[in-house]
Amino acid sequence: MDALNEIKRWRQELHQIPELGLQEFKTSKYLKDELTKMGYEPISILDTGVLVYLDNHQDKTLAFRSDMDALKISEQTNCSFTSCHNGYMHACGHDGHMAALLGLAKKLKEQPLKWKHNILLIFQPAEESPGGAKLIVEAGILKQYLSLIHI
């Protein structure tokens, strides 16, 4: 399967399992399963968050972050891949963000580059509320990182 079709598949599958912040258990399992298939050893954080760390033996780390949670909104679309969780949906693109970060993870595995940084992929729970970014910072996960790009 080519990269674009795989990202599309991930997005559609993730779109069907929207979960509120810090309740992203199915989403977390889905992400860990996909990352494991790629050859990674995903790390669980904050119960539902997921990390992948690529150690390039550098002093600094470059992090890429995606949000995971959905909103309490009933989906009213005619898509073939609508939410399976009545009353919840990915209404602001977090399904696409996760799919894009999975795409980056796959590309990094298929075509390893000589990075001048270690790489950290963060699938962050609770972006909408109750403040998953704050919880990640408070847990000390970002202390050593050079910069952060939010997908």
Language-model features and meaning:
Residues 75-76, 131-135:
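Short acidic, glycine/serine/threonine-rich loops at helix termini
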Residues 14, 64, 94, 121, ...:
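Divalent metal-coordination and catalytic microenvironments
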Residues 149-151:
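Conserved small/polar residues in nucleotide/adenosyl-binding loops
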Residues 116-124:
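Beta-strand segments within the central parallel beta-sheet cores of soluble alpha/beta enzyme folds
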Residues 1-90, 99, 106-116:
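Acidic/His- and Gly-rich active-site-bordering loop/insert found
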Residues 97-101, 130-133:
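Short glycine/serine/threonine-rich phosphate/pyrophosphate-binding segments
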Residues 20, 128-129:
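Glycine-/small-residue-rich active-site loops that bind phosphorylated ligands and cofactors
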Residues 140-145:
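Basic phosphate/pyrophosphate-binding loop/patch that engages nucleotide-derived ligands
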